[in-house]
Design a protein with these regions (language model features):
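FMN-binding flavodoxin-like domain, especially the glycine-rich phosphate-binding loop
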Residues: 3-4, 9-30, 34-37, 41-136
Length: 136
């Protein structure tokens, strides 16, 4: 199956997670600013973004992209992942709810989050997410 891994990263933490997801999926990995394909052409999509500000996704590049994905998310399997520095992961719960409301199935039932730099356990979970998406 054709899988895309698309992310925004400010410090490199979410980028490391994205690379692990892509490795697990055997998929290409794109920073959202560099992605020029059509996400509708993919069977599964992994989206990564850290928590920003008051636990929201990055607003200048990732938010508009996610809004675009919502338009055709129905019936798609979408994996979500990201890092955070504070809070309790509310941004990810909100993101999961948003994708489900758009009709998507959230891979693995929930997004993968890690505080700050992803440790080995978080990277293993990211690779497993990639494998799940590749099997869609």
């Amino acid at each position: 199956m054709k899988t895309a891994v698309i992310y925004w990263s400010g410090t490199g933490n979410t980028e490391a997670m994205a690379k692990a997801v892509a490795e697990g999926a055997g998929a290409e990995c794109f920073a959202v600013s560099e992605f020029s394909g059509n996400v509708e052409d993919y069977d599964a999509i992994a989206l990564g973004c850290p928590a920003m500000g008051a636990e929201v996704i990055e607003e200048d590049e990732m938010e508009p992209f996610v809004a675009e994905v919502e338009g055709f998310a129905s019936g798609k399997t979408i994996g979500l992942f990201g890092s955070y520095g504070w809070g309790d992961g509310q941004w990810m719960r909100d993101w999961e709810d948003r994708m489900k409301a758009a009709g998507a199935e959230v891979a693995c039932g929930e997004g993968i989050i890690t505080q700050e730099t992803p440790d080995d356990d978080a990277l293993v979970k990211c690779k497993e997410l990639g494998k799940t998406l590749a099997a869609v």
